[in-house]
Amino acid sequence: MPNGWIILDKPIGLGSTQAVGAVKRNLREAGFGKVKVGHGGTLDPLATGVLPIALGEATKLCGRMLDASKEYAFTVQFGAETDTLDLEGKVIAASEVLPSLADIESVLPRFTGPIEQVPPAYSALMVDGQRAYDLARKGEVVELKSRSVTIHELRLESANAQSATLIAHVSKGTYIRSLARDIARALGTVGHVIMLRRLRAGPFGLESAISLDKLNEVGKGAPLEHVLLPLEAGLVDIPALNLSPEQASMVRQGRVLTGLPQSDGLYWARAGNVPLALVELIAGDARVSRGFNLPDVAE
């Protein structure tokens, strides 16, 4: 069974669940049978860009990918706010105020660092057991609570009289549509997102991404290894812990390793180049927090 990551450059109009379905279909057509597949963070259908898709044992890392920071390029069109905060919605507010380049740059520091943000009514958040977007589509008033997010970096890429394109590096839980709405309001006008592209999700950037056409070649017989990144590609942000054969055997059994000299923290334990587990190291003791069942081809 294949284990690892396919990084899809998701095209516009394709939902994240549909993207997972496309991977499953191509794997099935390539003769791999039933493979566990999951994605590392929902991307709106109208958005494009990096969508990490995990196969096999890599699906155990989807939670980490959901928690990872993301980087986006987005364009906000000034003068109209829509109910969805993007191109799909109907206009609910309008303004003739068009901010200058200096105005835009002057407000960006207010949206850098920890901020409070109200998510869009058209979002996948749960409200009384239902998706917020389902309630909004029924015409119900959706009131979502403000939440704390962090904007690590926000910079202006380009601008004209009607719109501005920005780059944002953000924490998990950040809604770019809400960020665009709030920037426009801070400028004394209104706005909505007309372009959204994810440039990076955790360790994966566009340089690792493949097109849907490239993915479809797998279903027609192209080698999967040409598009599949190894499981450990999703672990580059944490240090590796090299194990002896005896230690590797203990980790496979879920036993605690003791007397280790490394600093406290999260590590990925490996035997040779084979990832065995995520381990939490505290005061010299390493405990398995998530094990991987991979073949010992490189041990």
Indicate where each model-derived feature is located.
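Catalytic cores of RNA-modifying enzymes
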Residues: 1-172, 176-210
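Accessory RNA 3′-end/elbow-binding domains used by RNA modification enzymes
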Residues: 1-32, 36-46, 186-299
